[in-house]
Amino acid sequence: MNRKMLLNLKLALRQAETDLGISNLPEFEREMLYGVLDVIDDEKAFSSDQLRKNTYVSRFTHATYHRILAKLVSDGWIGKAQGRVRNEYKLLKTF
């Protein structure tokens, strides 16, 4: 991959994030959303255990992981899954 191709990919990613409304989120929040998108099932549900092991968020410290998870819940991106186990969540906003 050459330098120009890499720069074009970065520009395309920025444009896609802008189009989806996530470009203004801090980096860790965006990374966790990528992790959520990677682990959700057909009903848009996921467990925090699945997410914690995901490549996008596995580098987060324990405290950062829980802080960002709580922030995404409070901002309405994800929520606790109704009628499911305590560590089950659901993606609320659609992409």
What is each model feature region?
Residues M1-N2, W77, L91:
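Intrinsically disordered, low-complexity regulatory regions
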Residues N24-L25, E43, T61:
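Residue-level marker of regulatory loop/turn positions in helix-turn-helix DNA-binding domains and
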Residues E27-R30, V36, R52, S58, ...:
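Non-catalytic interaction surface on structured domains
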Residues D42-Y56:
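Short acidic, hydrophobic short linear motifs in intrinsically disordered regions
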Residues R59-S74:
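Short amphipathic alpha-helical interaction segments
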Residues V73-G83:
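A short, conserved structural fragment
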